[in-house]
């Protein structure tokens, strides 16, 4: 029998090449320093990461590494048949359908979105490297029948982002990565916002290094996108990871009403002001909502959700006039 440290020695040799170490780390979903700690014995991989590690290794090393890991970890065979990073469990999918079937209409969007984002954050960032996931919604069509902007809504993050990102929501337009994904109805990844200056318009915020926007579609119509940011470069290179993101995006789509999906031809996004400019307008948002709820005339029968949407429309109109 091999010594328990044999798998660490083998891993140390494999990750001796810095480029290969970085590639494997990206595939596993951890920092490259984490791989080094596994190799030198200062930390132990979580059970779910053992399978990811095997899949990320070059083919010529997998069989030998699997033998070493099976000797060091008696439960490796059990881990091998469990769902990996690239899969969403059928149990969780049924949970989402159950919520959709039983939740009240006015709570459906928030409840489903938050439930899916909580699970996605745990599965996509198990090591809490740093990730933010936000549901970005199309604003309703303006008076000319066109959709001119998008709005961030439900959002969750792991450190260095705050847990609940909904209070930090802002408008996004043609200048943003989300805007590009919604306009083209195609996924839009940027692997390094500090280096990538291609045609993709990135809306870079604090801590964000790589990002992906995945369109939320139904019957060839679009409702917005799922916007995910990571503190790590190249975080969205892994095909299994992007497939997982697609699955979570489809589940988020269940939070929307059919009429919230719009024909792509009416998407005509405008440029939106920067974050600091927008924040000055958001300070009185609650006052706007209360004024609409207390209003008379055509606005007097609004419920809270309707008043909030009307307040967002007022803010959108004001920002587009700047």
Predicted regions and their residues:
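DNA major-groove recognition helix of helix-turn-helix/homeodomain DNA-binding modules
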Residues: 47-67
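Regulatory sensory and allosteric helical modules in signal-transduction proteins
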Residues: 137-199
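Helix-to-coil/beta transition segments that act as allosteric "coupling" elements at the rims
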Residues: 174, 199-223
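Regulatory loop-to-helix N-cap segments in sensory/regulatory domains
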Residues: 230-245, 259, 263
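A short, Lys/Arg-rich alpha-helix, primarily the initiator
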Residues: 1-27
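Recognition helix of helix-turn-helix/homeodomain-like DNA-binding domains
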Residues: 29-45
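Allosteric cytosolic regulatory segments
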Residues: 245-253
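Signal-transducing coiled-coil/dimerization helices and immediately adjacent hinge/linker segments
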Residues: 88, 257-322
